Amino acid sequence: MWRLMTAKGGNDPYLYSTNNFIGRQTWEFDPDYGTPAERAEVEEARLHFWNNRYQVKPSSDVLWRMQFLKEKNFKQIIPQVKVEDGEEITYEAATTTLRRAVHYFSALQADDGHWPAENAGPLFFLPPLVMCLYITGHLNTVFPAEHRIEILRYIYCHQNDDGGWGLHIEGHSTMFCTALSYICMRILGEGRDGGENNACARARKWILDHGSVTAIPSWGKTWLSILGLFDWSGSNPMPPEFWILPPFLPMHPAKMWCYCRMVYMPMSYLYGKRFVGPITPLILQLREELYAQAYDEINWRKVRHNCAKEDLYYPHPLIQDLMWDSLYIFTEPFLTRWPFNKLREKALQTTMKHIHYEDENSRYITIGCVEKVLCMLACWVEDPNGDYFKQHLARIPDYIWVAEDGMKMQSFGSQEWDTGFAIQALLASDLIDEIRPTLMKGHDFIKKSQVKENPSGDFKSMHRHISKGSWTFSDQDHGWQVSDCTAEALKCCLLFSRMPTEIVGDKMEDNQLFDAVNMLLSLQSKNGGLAAWEPAGSSEWLELLNPTEFFEDIVIEHEYVECTSSAIQAMVMFKKLYPGHRKKEIEVSITNAVQYLEDIQMPDGSWYGNWGVCFTYGTWFAMGGLTAAGKTYNNCQTLHKAVDFLIKSQRSDGGWGESYLSCPNKEYTPLEGNRSNLVHTSWAMMGLIHSRQAERDPTPLHRAAKLLINSQMESGDFPQQEITGVFMKNCMLHYAASRNIYPLWALAEYRKNVRLPSKSV
């Protein structure tokens, strides 16, 4: 059976940590683990997912939950509550449901204090890792037989009915992910017509029916070129010379959004090298299978700008295509010939210097999974037997996750993000005496996960921002500061600082709190909004050069409603506890941030959410920030409009439900059939509670609470529904812990802020 291990480093000499691997999550297969009954339970969960895969596409993350509940000997002993039609919700009913949720969720905490959870969903994460390991000859070492079975299970589980795969697990079929999944199946040993339910034959038919892989988008062209299934001359240029441009130029990598910079850094190295993996018999077979014409007859120059309509979310402006054409025709031919190839050699050396710097400052985790595989391959190309590559191999397990739908690759983990919200939800429950050990461990995890130092050396020359005092999205080893993760963790530390140390442990040192505030202030823009990773401010026109076809707003850093709201809430709380620290700066920061939130409100009263679905999510965040800063329904028209938006979008069953299509379409779209989603319902509930809806008319809150109470499962869990996370407008992300955190939190706020009748009265 599969088993989740936390905070374990093992004895690998190529593995090192800044805090003894606190927050690390790795899976191992133990053939002797589990009883026959437990193994049967796992198989039942797999079968249930398979049979319902078109109805509920995200996993319920069952495997590790079974493991933890067994290890903790958890049994739900608090009786379940249901609210009948026409029945009032009593204080006792709300308390019982809340206690059941709190006890169940506390049992899912890891020993190091964090809450593990799947953070995956995009279907272009895993195949490049399989391709990279195939090229480097490490596939069978890293992924033995049991791993390969689970990878194939995941691919089969998320194949669409038409034979293709979407950009993410809920998306329509795309050429990019269908081609990658097909290649992955073939590398893992499936025949050209093999796989569950004829998966390969159906996938190949989809590919050929939609123009063959000549229509794959640019990232696909890159990976296929690396693998030997495409010619580099069919790709737009990615010159590594960008890394030796003068820094004052607007298109210098230092001006880019960090993820864009980090993806194209190793891509440009591999492009500059024109690296191609070994041409094996399988590669030759795939050349025949993926095209509608003979491989040797393809005019690669003509397919450079081809992109299947199913993949095309962001059409390239004419000016961008002209730029690529100019580089392709006039620049590249010179840079590959003497004497200009000397410049290319220098550019490649500089690029590799940056790759090594980023690898070392993230303990070889890198900033994310797309970059991880590319940087690992670049290190192998530089030196197949070198320590850099071996240190990359040691960190692959950090990205792997196993659930009832198989093995997948995570974004890189949401340990700190999930734990920050989990702690706030549990504290809001006011059930402190029942969960003291849970709170103490959670506090300890947050304290130990703060980034204590800036990136090494002259980090500004490496285009890095300060990170000291921040929290990451995942764990301390990852190293990359994020403003909203920092703000939410800071809120937790401030809440804990007001509680007895015998309950929650020693409070965080003042200087560490000050470092967090300093980091947040450094990420605020002139318009009052906060960026996520690095200061925003590059020219907006650079977005015209977005080289991807399926993302938007990826070239430069932007401000975000969620980051801004989280920072407001943290700053307001900090100001009350430390009124003398940078008083004027913090007051100005809060004022400007509030103005930013008011400025970006949509005409219908909502806010566009950047990291969750979508207008419901953004509106919950914005309302939290505004009310923390003292705005009310009566003194703030912005808040008034937000309340109107939420009231109007409430469903007939009392809940809220928003389609993920709101994110790419940028227009509020209800779930099909006007059904509700419990996570969306929780966000909307908390937004209304922030605005003191209970004082005006508690009916919408009672209706929503009834839905949450009646939806709770026998164990105290809540059912998994639609995917709720998003990034870059068009790609969804599955936060498996959300279905527990937010209903629990909403019920806690409801019980605390809404007057409820008591049975005893």
From Swiss-Prot:
Subcellular location: Endoplasmic reticulum membrane
Residues with site note (Transition state stabilizer): 417, 473, 611
Record-level GO cellular component terms: endoplasmic reticulum membrane; lipid droplet
Catalytic reactions of this protein: (S)-2,3-epoxysqualene = beta-amyrin
Keyword annotations of the record: Endoplasmic reticulum, Isomerase, Isoprene biosynthesis, Membrane, Repeat
Annotated pathway: Secondary metabolite biosynthesis; terpenoid biosynthesis
Disulfide feature: none
UniProt entry tagged with the keyword Endoplasmic reticulum: yes
PROSITE patterns: TERPENE_SYNTHASES (PS01074)
Pfam families linked: SQHop_cyclase_C, SQHop_cyclase_N
UniProt cross-references to SUPFAM superfamilies, sorted A to Z: Terpenoid cyclases/Protein prenyltransferases
Statement: the UniProt record of this protein carries the keyword Metal-binding: no
MF (Gene Ontology): beta-amyrin synthase activity
Residues at the active site: 484 (proton donor)
GO BP terms in the entry: triterpenoid biosynthetic process
EC number(s) recorded for this UniProt protein: 5.4.99.39
Principal localisation: endoplasmic reticulum
PFTB repeat start and end residues: 98-140, 148-189, 439-483, 513-558, 590-630, 639-680, 701-742
Annotated membrane topology: Peripheral membrane protein
Quaternary organization: Monomer.
Family of the protein in this entry: Belongs to the terpene cyclase/mutase family.
Record function comment: Component of the oleanane-type triterpene saponins (e.g. ginsenosides or panaxosides) biosynthetic pathway. Oxidosqualene cyclase converting oxidosqualene into beta-amyrin, generating five rings and eight asymmetric centers in a single transformation.
Protein name (record): Beta-amyrin synthase 2
Species, as recorded: Panax ginseng (Korean ginseng)
Lineage, uppermost ranks: Eukaryota, Viridiplantae, Streptophyta, Embryophyta, Tracheophyta
Gene name for this UniProt entry: OSCPNY2
